């Protein structure tokens, strides 16, 4: 067919005050149903299964000048991180067992190796910048969706399978993945 009409909706530009903090995945699962998604107007969770941790990113609209608390990217959040990550992922194609170590290393270099409030990074940015995420690699992904309330069990099942958790592990759940 031929597209004959397009409707485009937009909102005026706005500024976001955002912060991100590293937590254990068990903390994410515990707070998922209660207040995780209500902490701010914008909330994202980046789950890193091999490290069993996640980053909670939350932001709220403000009227302040974006220069009041500018984002200071780490040295790893640029060309160095991009090239190191690409080369490690390339190597992991031939030595797949290093993938958990690659995740641990890249996560630690980009976000920090510790968890908790002391890992919080905060900034004020225009929304067009704040809502972007630097994955350090070109993304070609297959996205999928499930109802939000099923998120914790899906992630826990994947974690049990990926990390080969034993039934004696307190975070173990039957994953039902046959291989």
Show which residues each predicted segment covers:
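Noncatalytic alpha-helical scaffold of FAD-dependent oxidoreductases
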Residues: 1-179
């Amino acid at each position: 067919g031929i597209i004959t009409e397009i409707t485009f909706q937009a909102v005026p530009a706005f500024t976001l005050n955002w912060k991100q903090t590293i937590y254990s995945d068990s903390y994410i699962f515990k707070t998922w149903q209660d207040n995780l998604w209500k902490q701010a107007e914008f909330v994202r969770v980046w789950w890193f299964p091999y490290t069993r941790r996640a980053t909670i990113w939350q932001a709220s609209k403000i009227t302040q000048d974006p220069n009041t608390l500018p984002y200071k990217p780490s040295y790893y959040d640029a060309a160095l991180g991009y090239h190191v990550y690409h080369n490690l992922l390339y190597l992991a194609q031939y030595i797949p067992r290093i993938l958990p170590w690659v995740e641990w290393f890249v996560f630690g270099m980009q976000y920090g190796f510790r968890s908790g409030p002391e890992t919080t990074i905060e900034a004020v940015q225009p929304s067009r910048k704040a809502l972007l995420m630097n994955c350090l690699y070109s993304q070609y992904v297959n996205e999928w969706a499930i109802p939000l309330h099923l998120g914790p069990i899906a992630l826990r099942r994947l974690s049990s399978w990926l990390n080969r958790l034993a039934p004696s592990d307190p975070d173990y759940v039957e994953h039902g993945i046959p291989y």
